[in-house]
């Protein structure tokens, strides 16, 4: 490139819209940045820039920051000022690029911690928790006594599903503050709610909202906890009071609409979540679509669901991770064969409390089965509180071996590896004891983890005689029910109906493989039987598990599905309803209005419809 061309290139502004030249921003040569001596010369001007910003002389501060950063892209005071200005201007790409640069700069531990907290909070604000974790962890490691860093890591871990770890960091933040903080306590309360520890959550919410009654998110969380505890009138009253104070708050309005839907008031949902004046978010579209479905307006309902899925893909980057999970399934099938598993050691003797593993693609009815089992004396609902997937990730370290799961299981054949299944079982049981599931009266604890289809091989090693109950539902009803949800699923398969169908087929094929290679205590249960013939179907499940038949509650109590068992309680309990058959073969009515609705997934699902015995329902 000629000299003139190079000069033009050097003058080009950065694509991130920071206002800096790109050779001083995203395309900068870090090795050419000024050293400490040069930065010290500019430090006074950097502090003057901060002073201008603090005095609200924003134009002057911006001009000075751009000038200084053109000389020294790593001058922290000027970089922080430009970051704050671009953040206020909502220039997202620039805000992120500058935050990443700030977090990467060397400095005193407290300064590095603050910069990493800033970056983590940026990601948290966008729901990008996986990306938020490294800077949040870096902040805590740099300054472990920083309460804000502990709090932010608590948020990241909680929203990533690592609830007990999140709780520890929240409690550490409170201890470091040396006082109660309304925001931290409200976030701790939400964490406890997700753990099913509802009574504790209420106590923390009440304390948090006394300190910070202006915490809208906390008010909404408190209402959700009361709803989950069965105090629905109180929950709705709390939401009504909050909406009277903040009538334009969309989250509170959405929660109130969900309350309307739970009470069967679909018209109220449509009135509360209108199409205008604002464009609806994905969750709002789904709730409105569900209300339309209740009013027998299936075409409009599907239009809302389709719009929600489009938003998930376009705004939130939710695209099906087909290749990654196909490769994972192939690896599991290659490893988990009868020949390879036969010599591996098993845990003995039988566990004190028998886990009952529940399988079922999302919206197949496994949560309903868990709710019904939770009403039976001697059962506790383990839901997804301590998934075996966490153990599988820990195996390489526990085995003192390199390699990934499942190949690392070969180390069970070497030296002390034979004791590892028992150690893994103990860790699994200890986690459930810490959650409060191992009560003296409990003999069976359900495990409804979404990762269970992948863990059937590990289940066989840790709990050789554990019952595995697979809840099945007509595949087209499964597709339709998932279409109506704004919920991120494994592999982002929620992104579209074809993605749902492909992942359904992948998991069903994986389960079929495990059944062909392992001797599992496996019982298939149809959702349709569970909701139309509840007591006999549950009786068959209890007999298979080995629970005494006298423990089963009467049919009327089962169908009411309203008993409140001891905690912790799974999140799905908050949305439970009396057992009903509205969803049985629901796809038929939709197909009658939209014959091509399932056209894209028929080739994928028809073989499973036949194999599962649902072909007659299609006739």
Residue ranges of predicted features:
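Short secondary-structure boundary/capping segments
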Residues: 158, 193, 375-376, 462-463, ...
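ATP-dependent adenylate-handling active sites, centered on carboxylate activation for C-N bond formation
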Residues: 279, 440, 448-450, 460, ...
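Short beta-strand segments
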Residues: 358-360, 371, 383, 444-449, ...
């Amino acid at each position: 490139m000629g000299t003139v061309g190079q000069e033009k290139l050097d003058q080009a502004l950065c694509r991130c819209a920071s206002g800096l030249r790109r050779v001083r921003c995203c395309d900068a040569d870090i090795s050419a940045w000024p050293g400490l001596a040069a930065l010290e010369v500019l430090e006074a001007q950097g502090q003057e820039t901060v002073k201008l910003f603090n005095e609200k002389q924003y134009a002057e501060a911006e001009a000075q920051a751009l000038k200084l950063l053109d000389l020294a892209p790593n001058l922290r005071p000027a970089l922080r000022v430009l970051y704050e200005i671009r953040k206020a201007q909502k220039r997202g790409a620039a805000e992120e690029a500058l935050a990443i640069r700030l977090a990467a700069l060397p400095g005193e531990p407290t300064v590095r911690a603050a910069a990493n907290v800033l970056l983590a909070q940026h990601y948290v604000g966008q729901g990008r928790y996986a990306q938020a974790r490294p800077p949040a962890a870096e902040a805590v490691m740099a300054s472990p006594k920083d309460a804000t860093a502990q709090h932010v890591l608590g948020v990241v871990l909680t929203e990533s599903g690592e609830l007990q770890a999140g709780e520890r960091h929240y409690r550490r933040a409170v201890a470091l503050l040396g006082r109660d903080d309304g925001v931290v306590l409200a976030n701790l309360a939400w964490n406890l709610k997700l753990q099913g520890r509802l009574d504790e959550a209420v106590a923390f919410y009440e304390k948090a909202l006394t300190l910070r009654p202006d915490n809208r998110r906390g008010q909404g969380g408190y209402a959700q906890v009361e709803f989950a505890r069965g105090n629905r009138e109180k929950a709705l009253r709390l939401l009504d009071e909050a909406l009277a104070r903040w009538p334009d708050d969309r989250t509170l309005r959405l929660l109130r609409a969900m309350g309307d839907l739970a009470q069967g008031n679909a018209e109220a949902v449509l009135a509360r979540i209108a199409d205008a004046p604002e464009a609806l978010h994905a969750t709002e579209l789904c709730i409105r679509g569900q209300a339309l479905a209740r009013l027998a307006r299936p075409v409009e309902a599907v239009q809302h669901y389709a719009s929600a899925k489009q938003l998930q893909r376009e705004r939130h980057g939710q695209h099906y991770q087909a290749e990654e999970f196909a490769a994972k399934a192939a690896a599991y099938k290659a490893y988990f064969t009868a020949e390879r598993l036969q010599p591996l050691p098993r845990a003995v003797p039988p566990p004190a409390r028998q886990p009952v593993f529940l399988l079922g693609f999302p919206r197949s009815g496994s949560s309903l089965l868990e709710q019904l089992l939770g009403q039976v004396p001697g059962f506790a609902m383990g839901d997804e509180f301590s998934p075996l997937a966490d153990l599988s990730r820990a195996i390489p370290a526990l085995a003192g071996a390199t390699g990934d799961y499942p190949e690392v299981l070969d180390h069970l054949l070497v030296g002390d590896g034979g004791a590892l299944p028992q150690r893994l079982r103990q860790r699994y049981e200890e986690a459930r004891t810490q959650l409060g599931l191992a009560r003296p009266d409990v003999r069976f604890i359900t495990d409804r983890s979404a990762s269970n289809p992948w863990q059937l091989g590990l289940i066989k090693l840790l709990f050789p005689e554990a019952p595995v109950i697979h809840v099945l539902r007509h595949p087209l009803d499964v597709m339709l029910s998932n279409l109506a949800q704004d919920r991120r699923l494994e592999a982002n398969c929620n992104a579209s109906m074809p993605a749902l169908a492909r992942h359904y087929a992948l998991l069903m094929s994986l389960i079929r493989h495990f059944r062909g290679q392992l001797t599992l205590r496996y019982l298939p249960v149809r959702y349709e039987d569970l909701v139309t013939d509840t007591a006999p179907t549950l009786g068959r499940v209890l007999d298979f598990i080995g629970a005494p038949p006298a423990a089963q509650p009467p049919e009327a109590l089962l169908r009411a599905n309203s008993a409140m068992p001891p905690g912790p309680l799974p999140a799905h309990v908050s949305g439970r309803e009396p057992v009903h058959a509205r969803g049985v073969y629901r796809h038929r009515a939709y197909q009658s209005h939209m014959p091509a609705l399932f056209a894209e997934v028929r080739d994928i699902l028809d073989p499973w419809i036949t194999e599962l015995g649902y072909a007659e329902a299609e006739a």
